[in-house]
């Protein structure tokens, strides 16, 4: 198993992706002194008995209520218990672990004032596979992801439940005991520090971002295969066209499409004498649409990388002056905007793919392919309903792509009068990824079927490798059969990265690299 060293403020996107995939996590030792200094600063504030929000006051609208020193531990426990009011299905274990790692990185910067032993417990839970059961609904993305993070913190104090990969639920105290850990007694500010923050929204947004990156690469492969199946032109991918417009994503996706189609005998067969002047937009404008999606994902990636390496607690502790300053870093507007960007990109990637599927099944548009890609149309329906399925999934994603960040609703007796809705905006991304991956899977099957009708002509070497990998899992459709297993098998190849791997061509990604 790979391992990621969390150096607070310095974790690249690749590190967060590895953690989501199950990498082991350890906190870099360099951050330990800062954690201790911030905890000492909080202890000094308690000793001075000066009023500081969240340390010796109530919370939210109750911030003006002073709390006696004898009740400070109860105050922190109470905020956890009262705020653990989430509902809905639990977070996926992988995303919950990513949320915990993000919280660990935030606490490790020494601006939250939690004790070293509190950080050590969270670190040990990650190392020993203790994952809190966190209901996924209940956050509005300000003041932080309170309800979800309260469920995480509840497990740390032995309350609530934990969950494993199989979905088995275990009482939190028992889950801790099984691996030799003891529930935590929270110190001053610690309950608030663990609850305040955008880690729930950021974890979901990162998971959606990484899924979108995988999707975009698979969609480029599918789009190239559709160009050959429809006997389309590669002229629109000429680098001179894209250099004049200057958009980086457009330039890179055009290059990827050229690389994928290079050497295609299908393309060579109609270079001369083809009376079609221009292909439909779904083939011809792939660099413009996919490049714009790539640029949008990169903007979102930059925002999320910054957020993942920042501190979104409140108040923030500055040990050098002994101050605890109240602000609004918990407001997840940057995450909400990033999630909306990802949703728009996901929607458009799927929408363009569905249009290519529609082209391939329509004999009026597909340049000689049989209706619905079946040898005997009429007796067989072929790809008629898979295209309908793709249309349904794309339309569902269009509804989900409505920006979440434009919504707001006042909470906490109007003290928290503007919220980001980042949690909802980020949570919707994984279902959108799944929908879009299913659409790409349908396109791959349709494009491979279309190329089968062009035999003995062959596509390029990269695309022939993709066809071979696809045909190893899904045979050619010569007559109607129960279709669902074909779709499931193709979707599994897309989801698992086998399609991109088979192509063996460098494809652009969100961090500027290729894979």
Curated annotation (Swiss-Prot):
SUPFAM superfamilies: L-aspartase-like. Keywords: Cytoplasm, Histidine metabolism, Lyase. There is a cross-link at residues 142-144 (5-imidazolinone (Ala-Gly)). Its EC number is 4.3.1.3. Pathway: Amino-acid degradation; L-histidine degradation into L-glutamate; N-formimidoyl-L-glutamate from L-histidine: step 1/3. It is found in: Cytoplasm. It is an enzyme of class 4 (lyase). GO terms for molecular function: histidine ammonia-lyase activity. Contains an active site 4-methylidene-imidazol-5-one (MIO), which is formed autocatalytically by cyclization and dehydration of residues Ala-Ser-Gly. It comes from the Bacteria. NCBIfam families: hutH (TIGR01225), PRK09367.1 (NF006871). Belongs to the PAL/histidase family. Pfam families: Lyase_aromatic. It catalyses: L-histidine = trans-urocanate + NH4(+). The keyword Glycoprotein does not apply. PANTHER family: HISTIDINE AMMONIA-LYASE. InterPro entries: Aromatic_Lyase, Fumarase/histidase_N, HutH, L-Aspartase-like, Phe/His_NH3-lyase_AS. GO terms for cellular component: cytoplasm. It comes from Methylobacterium nodulans (strain LMG 21967 / CNCM I-2342 / ORS 2060). This is Histidine ammonia-lyase.
């Amino acid at each position: 198993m790979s391992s990621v060293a969390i150096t607070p403020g310095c974790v690249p996107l690749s590190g967060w992706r590895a953690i989501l995939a199950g990498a082991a996590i350890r906190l870099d030792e360099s951050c330990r002194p800062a954690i201790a200094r911030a905890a000492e600063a909080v202890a000094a504030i308690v000793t001075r008995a000066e009023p500081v929000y969240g340390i010796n006051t109530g919370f939210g609208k109750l911030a003006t209520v002073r709390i006696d020193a004898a009740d400070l531990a109860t105050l922190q426990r109470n905020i956890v218990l009262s705020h653990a009011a989430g509902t809905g299905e639990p977070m996926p274990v992988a995303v919950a672990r990513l949320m915990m790692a993000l919280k660990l990185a935030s606490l490790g910067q020494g601006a939250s004032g939690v004790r070293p032993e509190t950080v050590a417990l969270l670190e040990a839970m990650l190392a020993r596979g203790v994952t809190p059961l966190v209901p996924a609904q209940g956050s509005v993305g300000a003041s932080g992801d309170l309800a979800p993070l309260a469920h995480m913190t509840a497990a740390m104090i032995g309350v609530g439940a934990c969950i494993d990969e199989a979905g088995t639920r275990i009482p939190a105290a028992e889950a801790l005991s099984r691996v030799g850990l003891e529930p935590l007694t929270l110190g001053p500010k610690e309950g608030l520090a663990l609850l305040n923050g955008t880690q729930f929204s950021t974890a979901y947004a990162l998971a959606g971002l990484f899924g979108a990156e995988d999707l975009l690469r698979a969609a480029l492969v599918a789009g190239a295969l559709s160009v050959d199946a429809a006997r389309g032109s590669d002229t629109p991918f000429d680098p001179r066209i894209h250099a004049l417009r200057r958009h980086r994503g457009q330039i890179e996706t055009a290059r990827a499409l050229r690389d994928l189609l290079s050497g295609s005998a299908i393309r060579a067969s109609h270079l001369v004498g083809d009376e079609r002047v221009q292909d439909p937009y779904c083939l011809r404008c792939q660099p413009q649409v996919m490049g714009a999606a790539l640029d949008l994902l990169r903007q979102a990636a930059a925002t999320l990388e910054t957020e993942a390496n920042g501190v979104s607690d409140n108040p923030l502790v500055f040990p050098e002056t002994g101050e605890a300053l109240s602000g609004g870093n918990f407001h997840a507007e940057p995450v909400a905007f990033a999630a909306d960007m990802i949703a728009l990109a996901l929607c458009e990637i799927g929408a363009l793919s569905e249009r290519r599927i529609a082209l391939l099944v329509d004999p009026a548009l597909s340049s000689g392919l049989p209706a619905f890609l079946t040898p005997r149309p009429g007796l067989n329906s072929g790809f008629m309903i898979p295209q309908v399925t793709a249309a349904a999934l794309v339309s569902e994603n269009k509804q989900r792509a409505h920006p979440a960040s434009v919504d707001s609703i006042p909470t906490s007796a109007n003290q928290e009068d503007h919220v980001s809705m980042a949690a909802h905006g980020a949570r919707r991304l994984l279902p959108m990824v799944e929908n879009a991956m299913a659409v790409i899977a349908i396109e791959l099957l349709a494009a491979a079927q279309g190329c089968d009708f062009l035999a003995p002509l062959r596509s390029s070497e990269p695309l022939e490798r993709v066809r071979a990998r696809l045909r190893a899992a899904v045979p050619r459709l010569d007559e109607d059969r129960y279709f669902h297993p074909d779709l499931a098998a193709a979707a599994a190849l897309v989801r698992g990265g086998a399609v991109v791997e088979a192509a063996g061509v460098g494809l652009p990604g969100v961090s500027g690299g290729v894979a």
